[in-house]
Amino acid sequence: SYLKGLDLLGFKYEDRTEPFQGASGATHPVLAEAVTQFQSLAYKELLPADGPVRTRVMGQPSKAKSDQAERVKEFMNYQLMCEMPEYEPEFDQMLFNLPLAGSAFKKVYYDQAIGRCVSKFVPAEDLVVPYSATSLDDADTIMHIIKMPANDMRKLQVQGFYKDVELGTPAYSEDDIKESKNDLEGVSTTNKDEIFTLVECHVELDLEGFEDLGADQLPTGIKMPYIVTVEETTQKVLSIRRNYDIEDPMKRRKDYFVHFKFLPGLGFYGFGLIHMIGGLSRTATAALRQLLDAGTLSNLPAGFKMRGIRVRDEAQPLQPGEFRDVDAPGGRLDDAFKILPFKEPSQTLLALMGQVVAAGQRFASIADLQVGDGNQSAAVGTTVALLERGSRVMSSIHKRLYSSMKKEFMLLSNVFATYLPPTYPYDVVGGEKQIKATDFDSRVDIIPVADPNIFSQTQRIQLAQTGLQMAMSNPGMHNLYSAYRSMYEALGVKDIDTLLPPVAEPAPMDPSVEHINVLSGKSIKAFPNQDHTAHMKAHLAFMGT
């Protein structure tokens, strides 16, 4: 289970007394390694320093649309990287939890308490949907479990966001998953922690007095989307809010949540590494502990020593380094000691553990990619094919994250379009820019800056290097400038123009210079303001020589 799988991370050392006191409690890091490798790769690719958003123009391009797309891109990157300080740590934490649980959620909404848009990470255990739901889109009920400090609750009541009712002393409780996570972190709650548990229900209701009316102005009986917030202990309703636009004739539900999946599961929730390689991690841990225990017993042998025929504490197992008294008749000193025949750690068990670990690493795509160790004379596409074959799992996961981030940016743009003033100026480094609320329309598509087909810098460099090799193999058919520029971009070089000056634009030349270029295999170009008749006469005369 997910709860037991958290122990396989090895964050907490287990003090064991079986099979002997002080037996190894080490945990093999194959699962922790896979999680951190994925988190570091995804974080770097999906959240670059310049911002995660790029835009593209929908429909026929024009200068107005291009300017609009540029404004949207700059503003959203500015908001995410500067004005929303919680975005980076929340995204970072989400990427660490995602490969463990298999599912993670982001909640995008306008926070009344701080007066701006936020995008918060929601663990899978804090979001509940009906059993029959297969996605957020077809779930008729979505319940979000919210832990809120008493002071924050009072602020929202005073602001009028929640109904000002007496809630009493909060009775905070934790589920098994939260307790396990706190145990791994080494933290605990106290009785002084005043935290309310709220249940925010995104439901469909047919409320009396607010019925859906048909063309004849009679109730249709159709349920409409609402958000109902209830305090868990007192079960008092704190708020009921409409969850659709008044102008929308279809009265469609507004979306607030984005589902990130590591791997598709059998139902609503996705599968994570605990589900897929948890058994391998447990097997590797058991083998590792047996090898360490065998080494301990071999290095610190135990046995018996003679002292009569009775054995003291014969019911207790021997400990490493222990020589227990044995009541026996006298004799030679060599005969007074008996070392138990502990074997060295099994090489077969060691090899088996290596195979188990390799299987887990291969599945999680964290095995070292020996790209530089291949045959340098191999075909150009061979290395790329090997790289792609060894990383199919990571590539598919990256595409799922790309799709979820695209939906997250769409929800963010909807919030900006709703709450921004008609024109919103903001300061940036070296100047001032502005955005319009009307810029967030269907003419601009907002997508992640990451390439869904490329998930690591290693892959990006290898593809650029392959393209450069092909261009150098036949320079006459390729643009070497573009090939070298792509290589520098893959390497992450910032000042490319200083290393690779742009190709100079062709300028008008006199006929004699054009003759020299033709002889050297260079192309020539005609310009509008040239004397074309004189040029043609000169070229014909040159061809006749």
Locate each region found by the language model.
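Extended amphipathic alpha-helical segments with heptad-repeat/coiled-coil character used for oligomerization
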Residues: 98, 108-112, 120-121, 347, ...
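Intrinsically disordered or highly flexible coil/loop and linker segments, enriched in small
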Residues: 8, 52, 81-89, 100-104, ...
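Surface-exposed loop-to-helix/strand elements on domain peripheries
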Residues: 28, 51-81, 258-275, 304-319, ...
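Extended, helix-rich architectural segments
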Residues: 1-245, 313-315, 345-348, 352-355, ...
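Generic recognition of stable, solvent-exposed alpha-helical segments in well-folded globular domains
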Residues: 67, 71, 251, 255, ...
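C-terminal catalytic/scaffold cores in eukaryotic proteins
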Residues: 501-517, 522, 526, 530
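Composition- and surface-driven signal marking solvent-exposed, interaction-prone regions
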Residues: 221-226, 239-245, 253-259, 273, ...
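Catalytic nucleotidyl-transfer cores of nucleotide-processing enzymes
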Residues: 220-321
